[in-house]
């Protein structure tokens, strides 16, 4: 090998090493968020580690040394359940975060105002609930979030909290970086179940079987506010979590 090619090879290897060293979360790829539970009562593993996510101001899990739960709801539309959910949260004095889309805010301004008045956080689930991993242009990506910010401001007179949840849990490293550049913190989850299909709602017993054994320290719990089952079981669910020694914290605490 000539001296010239040797120098070129060394330079190329060094450049690639530098790129991999300085790109935050470089192991994160495009995908759909999923979980692998190893043992009941313990935090699951996600497609990316907490360190990889943290480099991009993202998380799926809180402090696993503390018996805290972070309760979140995704709200794509109203199915007659949110008022009851809010009633139960108020009765138990439990804070939650509601990730809303544009259609929800437009059609349910009074419920959105109630969320705010009762001390809950409202987060950004994008204007149209598109697959955001297909958006490589920062301006196009940003518009999905800023349009929702504008709508929320019109309805509540307040600024939207800078928490983002990717629609359908589909994400890419580029998306997470674009959200970070906009000042957002991205939140996935460490516990969920199939509650979103309104045509095939799980029974109360099935829901408890999925949720309670898998609850863990620092759990970020995703429920859908469209679920009639969730509205039915929430009171008992919160009671059981409290009896197990869990307390409920806000995302401000998680990202502190």
List where the protein language model places each region.
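Metal-dependent polysaccharide deacetylase catalytic core of the NodB/CE4 family, i.e.
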Residues: 67-69, 79-81, 90-222, 226
